[in-house]
Design a protein with these regions (language model features):
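Short alpha-helical segments in extracytoplasmic peptidoglycan/chitin-binding modules
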Residues: 16, 47, 61
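Short, well-ordered secondary-structure "scaffold" segments embedded in the functional core
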Residues: 57-304
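Structural motif corresponding to the C-terminal cap of alpha-helices
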Residues: 27, 31-34, 51, 55, ...
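Short, surface-exposed loop/turn segments at secondary-structure junctions
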Residues: 33-41, 256-263
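Short, amphipathic alpha-helical "recognition" segments used to contact nucleic acids or chromatin
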Residues: 42-54
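Charged, often Cys/His-bearing segments associated with DNA-binding zinc-finger transcription factors
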Residues: 1-35, 85-88, 290
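Generic alpha-helical secondary structure signal
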Residues: 18-22, 46, 243, 247
Length: 304
C-alpha cells in the first residue's frame, strides 16, 4: 500500500507516500526503530497506522501480513514507544516571539498562543471504573485537555482524566507547579477559552450572557456590536480548537472506538496520535485539506 499510488497510501495509512517514508526514516534515525529479521520498519509502521487509523483489530492483520498475533503486538508496541519518544519534539509551546497570523480571525488576538478546551475520547475500562469515566452524555471517555495553535497543531495535551471530570479541573491539574510536564503560559501570552473557564491571567474568555452563533451572523448583513462583536471575533478564532478535535478523531479512528488495550496503553496511544497529528500538520497536503473540508461541513451542519 505504501508502494502504490499516493491516494491508496493516504486512504489506508492516512499519510501520503512521501510523508509515510519520512516518518519511517525519522523513526529509524532518531528513535532507533530497526528492521527485524523478517519485518521491515515500513511494515511495522504500516501495521501501526492501520490499527490507529481504522481501528482494525490486530487479529485482522494476521491474514494480511501473514504474521503471528504476538509479532504484530510486539511491533505495534515498538512503534508506539518510538513515536512517544518524539513527543517533546512535536508537542511544545512556540517561542516567546511567535505571533498569531494577521488574518481576519487572529488579527484581534496577536499575543494569543491559540485556544484550549477539553476533548472527550472513547475508552474501554473495567465495569467497576465505568462510573468515573462516564461523561454527561453517558459515554465512557477520557477527558483530554488540548491546547492548539492557529495552524491546528497541538501545543500541549493532557489525556487520562476520567470523562466525569470537568474541563476546568483537568486544566488545574495541568498547571500544577509540581508536574514535570506542567502547562505554563509564557508571560504576556494567553489562550482563548470558552465560557466554561474563568477569565484571568493567561486566559481570555467571551462575555457571559451574550448570545452569539457563527452561522447566524454569517447569514446576516447585520453587524454585531460591542460585546456581541467581541464574542463573534472570539468565537471565530477559538473555533480552531473544535476543528482540530474533529479532524484529530476523524483521521485516527481508534479515538472514536472502544479498544481492548489496557487503559494505560489507551492513553499512550492517544498521545502517539497527537504526535502523528502534528507530524502531518507540519507537512500539509491537498488530501489533508479535503479531509478538513469534511470537518468544516460537519461543524457547519451541527446543531447550535
Amino acid at each position: 500500500m505504501y508502494d502504490g499510488s499516493d491516494v491508496a497510501c493516504y486512504d489506508q495509512l492516512h499519510l501520503t507516500k512521501r510523508n509515510f517514508h519520512d516518518l519511517c526514516t525519522m523513526l529509524r534515525e532518531r528513535c532507533g526503530l530497526r528492521d527485524s529479521v523478517y519485518v521491515t520498519v515500513e511494515e511495522k509502521v504500516a501495521m501501526f497506522l492501520l490499527v490507529v487509523g481504522h481501528s482494525i483489530k490486530m487479529r485482522m492483520l494476521r491474514g494480511t501480513y501473514k504474521r503471528s498475533l504476538w509479532t504484530i503486538r510486539t511491533h505495534f508496541s515498538d512503534v508506539l514507544t518510538a513515536l512517544l519518544s518524539l513527543y517533546g519534539e512535536f508537542i511544545k509551546l512556540p517561542s516567546a516571539t511567535a505571533q498569531a497570523p494577521n488574518d481576519y480571525k487572529w488579527k484581534w488576538f496577536g499575543n494569543a498562543l491559540g485556544a484550549l478546551d477539553g476533548c472527550h475520547i472513547d475508552v474501554l475500562v473495567d465495569v467497576a471504573d465505568q462510573g468515573r469515566y462516564r461523561n454527561r452524555k453517558q459515554a465512557i471517555t477520557t477527558n483530554m485537555l488540548g491546547v492548539v495553535d492557529w495552524n491546528m497543531k497541538f501545543l500541549y495535551v493532557l489525556p487520562g482524566w476520567e470523562g466525569s471530570v470537568s474541563d476546568s479541573r483537568v486544566l488545574r491539574d495541568a498547571m500544577r507547579t509540581n508536574r514535570q510536564d506542567a502547562f505554563v503560559i509564557p508571560k504576556g501570552k494567553y489562550c482563548l477559552v470558552d465560557a466554561g473557564y474563568t477569565n484571568g491571567e493567561g486566559f481570555l474568555a467571551p462575555f457571559r450572557s451574550t448570545r452569539y452563533h457563527l452561522k447566524e451572523w454569517a447569514a446576516s448583513a447585520q453587524q454585531p456590536q460591542t460585546a456581541k462583536l467581541y464574542n463573534l471575533r472570539h468565537s471565530c478564532a477559538r473555533n480552531v480548537v473544535e476543528r482540530t478535535f474533529v479532524l484529530f478523531k476523524k483521521k485516527w479512528d481508534i479515538l472514536r472506538s472502544q479498544t481492548f488495550f489496557d487503559i494505560k496503553d489507551q492513553i499512550r496511544i492517544i498521545s502517539a496520535c497527537c504526535v502523528l497529528h502534528n507530524f502531518a500538520r507540519d507537512r500539509q497536503h491537498v488530501m489533508d485539506d479535503l479531509l478538513l473540508h469534511e470537518v468544516d461541513s460537519e461543524l457547519a451542519n451541527a446543531p447550535n
